[in-house]
């Protein structure tokens, strides 16, 4: 497997990617939290960033979103080198982040949350009719037909609240949408709802960065896959270069599972029985070797 990522243009596109990082890294004091990360995000594509806890996903998000600055490598937005001082600067460049703990006020109506901090005024008063009408239309464009945008947003399902946040970011000019674990706290049905919204955002020409630890959610919607482990790049693939099973295997840590299986087997008794079960699961996942290793 080739773990050194290479940046390639998608299809025949000649325009600069919306976002490009080359050999980017971040230090926290003496701790190297992120090292050698290269990725690109183009309009109309979903780039999935996968990794377990502590892989470096949050650090990567914070660099792209303007919360932290990178210490190594380069970061470009539409071909322009950048080093943001704040999330507002990133937002001004069209980079919006939807975090797992959504920035919504549960008791406020849907339309108030949609325009929160960006209220439209007609003279000295808020233009309530415009904001209600716009909220309903924008949500409908994303596939949610709310009967009443005056209902508290807390009454919506988790997937629907994610949709409101995504739709809000699109309406206010996002070109790149960073989604931080949007399906982590959702059930199967609501996860499917969010994945459909991700596809719709891609079809509207946005570049989407989908942060997740779940390859089964990433693979159906992703065009590129960046795998991180302990701050380093484990692999960077386009969709035609890796299967879902291989992606799952890399996430599951095939080599580590095989090593554990051998350790258990040498212990005999119940440990050996557990090793046989684990070995069967490893084979079923098709892990233990990297894509292209054969």
Can you say where each PLM-predicted feature lies in the sequence?
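Glycine-rich phosphate-binding loops of nucleotide-dependent enzymes
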Residues: 2-294
């Amino acid at each position: 497997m080739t773990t050194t990522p290479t940046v390639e243009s998608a299809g025949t596109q000649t325009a600069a990617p919306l976002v490009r990082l080359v050999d980017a890294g971040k230090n926290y004091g003496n701790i190297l939290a992120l090292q050698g990360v290269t990725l690109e995000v183009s309009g109309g594509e979903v780039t999935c960033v996968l990794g377990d806890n502590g892989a470096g996903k949050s650090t990567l998000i914070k660099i792209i979103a303007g919360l932290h600055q990178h210490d190594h490598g380069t970061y470009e937005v539409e071909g322009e080198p950048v080093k943001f001082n704040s999330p507002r600067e990133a937002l001004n460049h069209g980079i919006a982040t939807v975090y797992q703990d959504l920035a919504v006020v549960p008791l406020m109506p849907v339309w108030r949350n949609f325009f929160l901090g960006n209220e439209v005024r007609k003279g000295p008063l808020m233009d309530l009719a415009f904001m209600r009408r716009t909220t309903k239309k924008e949500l409908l464009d994303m596939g949610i037909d709310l009967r009443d945008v005056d209902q508290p947003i807390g009454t919506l399902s988790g997937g629907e609240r994610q949709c409101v946040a995504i739709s809000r970011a699109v309406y206010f000019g996002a070109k790149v949408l960073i989604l931080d674990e949007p399906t982590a706290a959702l059930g199967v049905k609501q996860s499917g709802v969010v994945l459909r919204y991700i596809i719709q955002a891609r079809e509207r020409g946005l570049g989407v960065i989908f942060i997740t630890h779940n390859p089964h959610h990433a693979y159906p919607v992703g065009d590129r896959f960046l795998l991180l482990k302990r701050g380093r790049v484990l692999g960077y693939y386009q969709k035609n270069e890796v299967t879902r099973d291989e992606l799952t295997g890399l996430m599951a840590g095939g080599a580590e599972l095989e090593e554990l299986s051998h350790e258990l087997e040498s212990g005999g008794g119940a440990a050996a029985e557990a090793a046989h079960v684990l070995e069967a699961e490893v084979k079923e996942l098709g892990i233990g070797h990297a894509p292209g290793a054969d």
